[in-house]
UniProtKB/Swiss-Prot annotation:
Residues 349-491 form the Helicase C-terminal domain. Gene3D superfamilies: 3.30.70.2280, P-loop containing nucleotide triphosphate hydrolases. GO terms for molecular function: ATP binding; ATP hydrolysis activity; mRNA binding; RNA helicase activity. This is DEAD-box ATP-dependent RNA helicase 7. It comes from Spinacia oleracea. InterPro entries: DEAD/DEAH_box_helicase_dom (IPR011545), DEAD_box_RNA_helicases (IPR050547), GUCT (IPR012562), Helicase_ATP-bd (IPR014001), Helicase_C-like (IPR001650), P-loop_NTPase (IPR027417), RBD_domain_sf (IPR035979), RNA-helicase_DEAD-box_CS (IPR000629). ATP binds at A151, R152, T153, G154, Q155, G156, K157, T158. The gene is RH7.
Length: 685
């Protein structure tokens, strides 16, 4: 089958710039003709000196895209000359500068057929220029072309169809075709994979469509039928929904597509992954007058099913706008990608420190692989809320609203939110383990660094079961390999914040605490600096600071590197070497053994209390070096195999991470499921 780009006119950023440049040159040419005509009439009424001045002013007008700088109150009775640039007020000069900047940006709103009401809404939201995917698709949609649009996640694909569809319905070619009045059939149908995404796309249609008198509703499972049926019965212009509920409403005869002008498939690749293939094909096939319907397909990736859909249901003259193409880099380039080794049991203690180090005080989303682990982890983290498919839709909407408004700053979610969330100011993404599919990593990490912002994506991984290299290779990202934040480093950062907070306290408290402070200073035997350090620690919530493993992130452990002067071909060799100079019980107590990438040694964790025993023992062993690791060396990765999920699925009968016969096998991530202890996935065996 030929590729989409071969069957249609592919559009690139370079061709768009050329078109914009040609349009700009044409406008300049037209302006010159008009200006010459005006200049001719003026010359008949002016002296030679004023004619010279008019000629100079005409050149300045041309450079400024004919921005009208006249001020009628400043004109003389017998002159129509423009005010000279030297006489401009600062306010006018600023307007002139902004106009020049706007003219230089090919994606400026002024370069597109956007009506004033919509332009006003965009400007009110701080949008003065379209994103590349929006700019490159706008004219095609307005002109009635079927279209396939592909861009990296977080690059504004939603507005790429919302804006031109709304403009077309009220001012464009479909204006006279759109139905009106009570009970009208919808003109637009948007299909997408999740309820969360439906809610957000609806919100965009309500903002932009509402500004020009259009109405919209969303239909999805988990919400009552009667309210959705009521909306459709009253009549709407735009319907946004998930395939399952749209199919149900079509079969009930409540949703009718007889007046459809636009059909949109948003996140088409995700609908494939979620098993909506049959439903999507059935819905698309329900449209009879296909020649009158414009079809738009947007996707971050183009798997074979998406290509087949575009061939079957889009017109042969369709356009393709591909901002990814064959580029290797598919993950967001505005995101800092970090990987940190961490065992499952260490996550609840480590994640808060990761948020402190990389969250910058903003919103954070934590992704887990199961619903159970999302709920359990949210319960262990202060100020966090879970979001997954088992939560009632009304509660999910309340949760999302609270997250957007800053009522709480940490969301723990399953993949249900990976494509559905479109919140521009998420600062940090944490993935508790490498996802099974590389595309999942791309979409999860793409929840930050959106709409021109930057962000951080941290992925935790077990060094013994890692697919980091595979994700790095296939997504095109370059991971920063970092160790778990050490409690002492986190405490230093928190201490700076606590010190700044102390300076904000009113001096009125000093008399009340001064006597106690002086007594403490005179009797404690500590210096003033030491006492103040302890006070800052208390204010920051610290009573002590523990060591943390660089290998697994577990508190109370330290990571060692073993070098025996010969290659390590298996983990068992590390135990053999250790038993030469340590009691068997001590050797067997080590945790998280992993070989270095060059097989020259092995790293593992030991309890802090046993550190001295290990180091002294190694000093008395010939040909053995044992050192405390300051930074992890590159480690050997082991490919994960599909049967790792055992007979119990992702957690087996025990649930969570691990489980009897499931999870990572026999409680590999701990016991019988859940978080902690013998019954918890985040507990040790």
């Amino acid at each position: 089958m030929p590729s989409i780009s071969m069957m249609s006119d592919a559009i690139t950023p370079e061709t768009l710039k050329k078109e914009k440049k040609m349009k700009s040159e044409t406008l300049d040419s037209d302006d010159t003709v008009v200006k010459k005509e005006k200049s001719s009439s003026k010359k008949k009424e002016k002296s030679s000196s004023s004619g010279k001045k008019d000629k100079e002013e005409k050149e300045k007008k041309k450079k400024r895209k004919a921005v009208d700088l006249d001020d009628s109150s400043d004109k003389s009775d017998n002159s129509s000359e423009l005010v000279q640039a030297d006489d401009l007020k600062p306010k006018k000069a600023k307007v002139m500068e902004e106009a020049v900047v706007e003219a230089e940006d090919p994606n400026s709103l002024s370069n597109f057929r956007i009506s004033k009401p919509l332009k006003d809404v965009l400007i009110s939201k701080g949008i003065k220029a379209l994103f590349p995917i929006q700019a490159m698709t706008f004219d095609n949609v307005i002109d009635g072309c079927d279209l396939v649009g592909r861009a990296r996640t977080g690059q504004g694909k939603t507005l790429a169809f919302v804006l031109p569809i709304v403009e077309s319905l009220v001012n464009g070619r479909t204006k006279d075709l759109r139905r009106s009045g009570h009970g009208r059939l919808p003109s637009v149908l948007v299909l997408l994979p999740t309820r969360e995404l439906a809610t957000q796309v609806l919100a965009d249609f309500q903002v932009y469509g509402g500004a020009v008198g259009l109405t919209a509703c969303s239909v999805y499972g988990g919400a009552p039928f009667h309210s959705q049926i009521s909306s459709l019965t009253r009549g709407v212009d735009i319907v946004v929904g998930t395939p399952g509920r749209v199919k149900d409403l079509l079969e009930k005869g409540v949703l009718k597509l007889g007046s459809l002008l636009f059909r949109v498939l948003d996140e088409a690749d995700e609908m494939l992954k979620m098993g909506f293939v049959d439903d999507v094909e059935l819905i698309l096939g329900k449209v009879d007058h296909v020649s009158k319907v414009q079809t738009l397909l947007f996707s971050a990736t183009l798997p074979s099913w998406v290509k087949q859909i575009s061939t079957r249901f889009l017109k042969s003259a369709k356009k393709t706008v591909d901002l990814v193409s064959d580029q290797k880099m598919k993950a967001s380039i505005s995101v800092r990608h970090i990987v940190i080794p961490c065992s499952a049991s260490a996550r609840p203690d480590l994640i808060p420190d990761i948020i402190r180090c990389y969250g910058s005080g903003g919103r954070s989303i934590i992704f887990t692989e199961t619903k159970e682990s999302a709920s359990q982890l949210a319960g262990l983290l202060t100020g966090a809320r879970p979001l997954h498919g088992d939560i009632q839709q009304t509660q999910r909407e309340v949760t999302l609203k609270g997250f957007r408004t800053g009522k709480f700053m940490t969301l723990v979610a399953t993949n249900v939110a990976a494509r559905g969330l479109d919140i521009n100011d998420v600062q940090l993404i944490i993935q508790c383990e490498p996802p099974r599919d590389v595309e999942d990593y791309i979409h999860r990490s793409g929840r930050t660094g959106r709409a021109g912002n930057t962000g951080v994506a941290v992925m935790l991984y077990d060094p013994k079961r890692s697919s980091v290299t595979k994700i790095e290779r296939e997504s095109g990202v370059k991971f920063e390999h970092l160790s778990a934040p050490q409690p002492v480093d986190v405490a230093k950062a928190v201490g700076i914040e606590a010190a700044a907070a102390i300076l904000q306290i009113s001096d009125s408290v000093i008399p009340a605490f001064k006597d106690a402070a002086e007594e403490l200073l005179s009797t404690s035997g500590l210096s003033a600096v030491d006492i103040l350090s302890k006070a800052l620690a208390k204010a920051a919530g610290y009573s002590d600071i523990k060591e943390r493993s660089l290998l697994t992130g577990m508190e109370g452990y330290v990571t060692l590197l073993l070098d025996a002067g010969r290659p390590f071909y298996g983990q068992s060799f590390a135990y053999t070497v250790l038993k030469r100079f340590l009691p068997a019980t001590k050797a067997d107590s080590i945790m998280g053994v992993a070989l270095t990438a060059d097989k020259s040694g092995a790293v593992f964790d030991v309890p802090v209390d046993d550190l001295e025993t290990f180091l002294v023992g190694a000093e008395n062993a010939a040909g053995v070096n044992l050192d405390v690791v300051k930074a992890l060396p590159p480690l050997e990765e082991k490919v994960q195999i599909s049967r790792r999920f055992g007979g119990g699925g992702r957690g087996g009968r025990g649930g969570g991470y691990g489980g009897r016969g499931g999870g990572y096998g026999g409680g590999g991530y701990g016991g019988g499921g859940g978080y902690g202890g013998r019954g918890g996935g985040y507990g040790r065996r």
